Amino acid sequence: MPKREDINKILVLGSGPIIIGQAAEFDYSGTQACLSLKELGYQTVLINSNPATIMTDTDIADKVYIEPLTLQFVSQILRKELPDAILPTLGGQQGLNMAMELSEAGILDELGIELLGTKLDAIDQAEDRERFRALMNDLNEPVPDSGIATTVEEAVSFADQSGYPVIVRPAFTMGGTGGGIAQDEAELRKITANGLTLSPVTQVLIEQSIAGLKEIEFEVMRDSVDNAIVVCNMENFDPVGIHTGDSIVYAPVQTLTDREVQMLRDASLSIIRALKIEGGCNVQLALDPAQDRYYVIEVNPRVSRSSALASKATGYPIAKVAAKIAVGLTLDEILNPVTGTTLAEFEPALDYVVCKIPRWPFDKFVRADRRLGTQMKATGEVMAVGRNVEEATQKAIRSLDIDINYIGDEELADLNEADLVDGIIHARDDRIFYLYEAIKRGYSVDKLADLTKINVYYLDKLLHIYEIEQELIATPFNADVLELAKKNGFSDEVIGKMWKTNEKEVRAYREQMGLSPVYKMIDTCAGEFESQTPYYYSTYELENESIVSNRKSIVVLGSGPIRIGQGVEFDYATVHSIQAIRQMGYEAIVVNNNPETVSTDFSMSDKLYFEPLTVEDVMNVIDLEKPEGVIVQFGGQTAINLAEPLAERGIKIFGTTVENVNRAEDRDEFNKLIQANGIRQPQGRTATTTSGAIEAAESIGYPVLVRPSYVLGGRAMEIVHAKEELENYMKNAVKVSHNHPVLVDQYLVGKECEVDVISDGENVVIPGIMEHIERSGVHSGDSMTVYPAQTLSQKVQDEIVKVSIKLAQSLECIGLMNIQFVVHNDEAYVIEVNPRASRTVPIMSKVTDLPMARLATRAILGESLVNQGLKPGLHPAGEIIHVKAPVFSFTKLDNVDSLLGPEMKSTGEVMGSDRTMAKALYKAFEGAKMHMPDHGKVLITVKDEDKGEAIDFARRFWELGYQLVATKGTAQTLAAHGLKVETVGKMTEENNIVDRIHDHRIQMVINTISDSTTSAADGIKIRSTALTYGVPLFTALDTVDAILQVLESQAFTTLHL
């Protein structure tokens, strides 16, 4: 069937902010879909609330709306744009749920708008647990024994009959949100209550546990004439019971027989056909090889996280093909863009092994519960490609950008036996390291398989790595053993440790032996057809498939996996840099390892190397390609950290020099620069010991802000009020040394603001000044931000511009730089300078209409800003007010305190834009899913120093018609100022705060911490309960002021005579 001519305008629903379970993969799929539809000649309209994505760039769709993905705003845009159709299946769970909501509200019928791709009934059938179970029974597809519950008591009743353990799976959620495995009634009650709250239809499936079986995924495609194919099959390293987003995954499947693969393939195709899904679909199955049977776990009737992985693993562009299927094209009409010759109906073939390992946020949240289950906890993932499981796994581990770059974690050597076994049985994010340690200690693979239900095949691979390790230790500088090690993924650095030498010596010996990697192409067809893809991975074989052109090339280093502090914003900057390089006539070569992102779409660059971001792996690419140089400033701290070692090896680093980057990041050097220019900054000192830190704090005066040097996202940063707190911080939060000092700064209370700077080494352009709503002490990534600045005096703004220009020129900045200020007593103090792209680049590029990363790249490559049409100084601001709001994933992580502070905790962001501050704030809160009730009870429980401000806020809530509830101390303060307030009991008393939140007798919580340990523990419990039950929670008083501005702008004044 040719493409449909009866539709012209198509609206694409985006996926909203990045949260755990819904990350950058939807930026990738949404971008692909929009470009695909434009290519076919359709007019496209996009709605997405996330300003950090490539998808919301104005050139991706014909019209882009960065607006809240709520019924109110989407309906308004639909009535204005009147599209012929909506495509919801590329916007994750958010897109599907929005489509269902629009249909139920009658908007689609009212406006005569058609839903493209998978039909609503199919979505409902796949997502509604009861209907899905009924369909599987009709198809004779086996599902675990299960029951539907809409109350906690119904869940308990099913479990009483079936026995424990049971798995709880909420309907219409993603990332396993609200789910879990319950071992007993108490756990079941807790998980079900949470699951019912988080399910938009208040429904959960209670399922007999099949934990321990093999978990297999099939990524399938179907078109409107019932052609259906399998794009990719994948096997989870971890058995059923751990969310696939938290599991190590291999493609293609490694341990299944041909018969088993065929059995599961037939089931997957039968299901997609029965659901009549048009586009991409992910089928998850559990296989019990011992009984020769399987179960269907669930189906995602949309493009998913696994689709992005399958696309990158195979080279098959699932989202692009799905968009074309949605407008009527069939698989036998769509050309495969990888080969340029085969059609999309050909199933990809893989002649390599792909390994995906999740990236978890536990380096940020050290107190979080690291145990893995059916609710996803990872923020991102890495992918590595090799010729065998060992090579792919080892490359994936060193792609994670964690402190461990080898499967043999030296710190586990001192672990006692009981803790080792516990770490093996109770799966955590680091279980693979525990398994390897157990193998080193002589545990048999059969014993480990019995303890974990992980297939012996994979444990054998770990044993093989250990055997090679032993050979390396026994025979240093042996060419045959070295070749064996390299073919199995060992890095030069790790081999150096085993040979008691260093990475450079190993590299020199390897090159002397003529041992260098070759690059193989990912081409969807295992080399069967001629391919056009410039998409490569390294391995140690003979034939190199990456042909070096005679064009001048530039290597751009990506930012690796999505994590807190280094999110999709850096991928945005990377993609813009690639575009500028290509526009200037250079060949753009990307090195990155994140399967979720736009930068690793092979069509974005001239060449893509899917490799770990380490010195060795990057140098191997450079040795082959011989580029003009490398750009590091768009890849976050991951890429910046590679600048110095690459420069030491004679590689040209484009942009700000390594020496000037170090001047900005080294505290003593930076202090000298600040003083030489007469710039204000909070007093600060460095310390390399605990006693040195205490001495520094006492000379500056408490409170102080302490942090390690060279960090991103405020890792291990705290505000410390007393000596005991500082001693505890030094002991538990940082590893301090002469090479890694701790920074101790005066903590100034004031308003924070920040600027991004573009410089060509001479001219300096400041796109705008962003003002933070929360006062200093809250990490910039977690603060609400407004542009243009609303409350800064002209004097302060002028000072910020002057200081920013002076700093950029003094640091000889070429490219981008970010500067953060605190305004104290109407004076601007510099608190931080980051000589690289920051996480504010996407949002500022959009609100100022200055493509900052593109402009910066052109400056880096020698084109002056003036020649690019820019006027030096502060770029004039428009009339529209833009508010960025952070978005958090606290409901996914147990034991993580939601109190905001100097350590970054948000996973994503949204933007609200309008002509007034109150309207922009309202949109930002709505986009962040912080919907405010217009009446009810507000709980106020604050520390002593906040009580003065709390009185004013309480009065404003009271005047709006809200009732006030407070704990004893706060209640007395409010009552003394003439406010009617109800006193509520503390945690140990009856009718306490937590009970009331649990019973929905509190509609909003304002809670700031007290430093005393009992109150601190109470505060954590109050906050976590509010989050669990979906009650709006505020832990910073400035955010309360912002929400009051919104509520007051919507309220009418009622006057009595």
From Swiss-Prot:
Q: Which residues form the signal peptide?
A: none
The EC number(s) attached to this protein equal: 6.3.4.16, 6.3.5.5
Q: Which cofactor does it need?
A: Mg(2+); Mn(2+)
- UniProt keyword terms in alphabetical order: Amino-acid biosynthesis, Arginine biosynthesis, ATP-binding, Ligase, Magnesium, Manganese, Metal-binding, Nucleotide-binding, Pyrimidine biosynthesis, Repeat
Annotated binding of Mn(2+) 2, by residue: E298, N300
A Pfam match is CPSase_L_D2
Q: Which species expresses this protein natively?
A: Pediococcus pentosaceus (strain ATCC 25745 / CCUG 21536 / LMG 10740 / 183-1w)
Instruction: Kindly list the positions annotated as binding Mg(2+) 3.
Output: Q820, E832
Positions of region (Carboxyphosphate synthetic domain): 1-401
Q: Where is the ATP-grasp domain?
A: 133-327, 671-861
Give me the residues that bind Mn(2+) 4, please. Answer: E832, N834
Q: Where is this region: Oligomerization domain?
A: 402-546
Q: Which residues bind Mg(2+) 4?
A: E832, N834
Domain (MGS-like) spans 930-1057
Give an example GO molecular function. Answer: carbamoyl-phosphate synthase (glutamine-hydrolyzing) activity
What name is this protein filed under? Carbamoyl phosphate synthase large chain
Q: What class of enzyme is it?
A: ligase
Query: Which sites bind Mg(2+) 1?
Result: Q284, E298
